[in-house]
UniProtKB/Swiss-Prot annotation:
The gene is gpsA. This is Glycerol-3-phosphate dehydrogenase [NAD(P)+]. It comes from Aliivibrio fischeri (strain ATCC 700601 / ES114) (Vibrio fischeri). SUPFAM superfamilies: 6-phosphogluconate dehydrogenase C-terminal domain-like (SSF48179), NAD(P)-binding Rossmann-fold domains (SSF51735). One of its GO terms (cellular component) is cytosol. Belongs to the NAD-dependent glycerol-3-phosphate dehydrogenase family.
Amino acid sequence: MVTMTTQTDYSDISMTVLGAGSYGTSLAISLARNGAKVILWGHEEAHMNRLEADRANEEFLPGVAFPPSLIMSTDLEKSVQASRDLLVVVPSHVFGLVLGNVKPFLRDDSRICWATKGLEPETGRLLKEVAVEALGESHSLAVLSGPTFAKELASGMPTAIAVASPDKEFVKDLQEKIHCSKTFRVYANNDFTGMQLGGAVKNVIAIGAGMSDGIGFGANARTALITRGLAEMTRLGVALGAEAETFMGMAGLGDLVLTCTDNQSRNRRFGLALGQGGDVDSAQEEIGQVVEGYRNTKEVWLLANRMGVEMPIVEQIYQVLYQGKDARVAAQDLLARDKKSES
């Protein structure tokens, strides 16, 4: 078992990162590079043993050595209690489960930030609602979101992201801990709702962009889809009380463009496979990692229907993923819609 032992010095831990996938690991590496002591917790003992033995994540982040101040752990209780600040980086479909497991070990002063992008499965609820239900309202909450690929972040390539929380002191502290003037810029944002929504919707639109390219429609179609996808994202956000300008920032347009245009994106590659004639199961198997956008599509579709917000791109992607519609037919149906005003 990879755990902090009695010999492990876990005083002065700056942050505990919960989730040792590629993105959680890359964030933990970035934090530790700033000179802070950071715990990276994961629940799979074999995986964590391998990370500790290699002092790297050779499967998904090859060639990126762990900083000496990065500590591996599978002990959830010690990991949670060692730091006031927790950064949750797990898939959205297990977000509530992980928080429920964390709750018994929280300190009175614990603050929780998440970099998970998505909504609650089967309900489409924002993750803030899930967090409050799991943890109560006595802990500060924050969301970290923006255009980041794990490999580039871990490699120290220049990256910018945003953080939002109702607790302004928490935002300031997170900026201090995460921001690195050389490679990693962190912007403060006041829109807690919009910051949560952008990361979920962009995953769905990225699948659509991949489908478009897989069919062979070219750059014009991809750009139109991104632009109209941004309009759908903004409409839903405003209906939920978010600020429209948030979606022109890091967690909206920034993340959307990145995910729709680069093949490092699992969601885009998933869509490419579908556009080229693959089915959902074979496309997911081809990716080999969690494709958040698959679940996000149903979640966003549920939320849009509940709010009465028209999202025709999301509707067509939902029909492809969950109702067996052919991607080419979905594209034709989008193009055949009645003439509309752009606004």
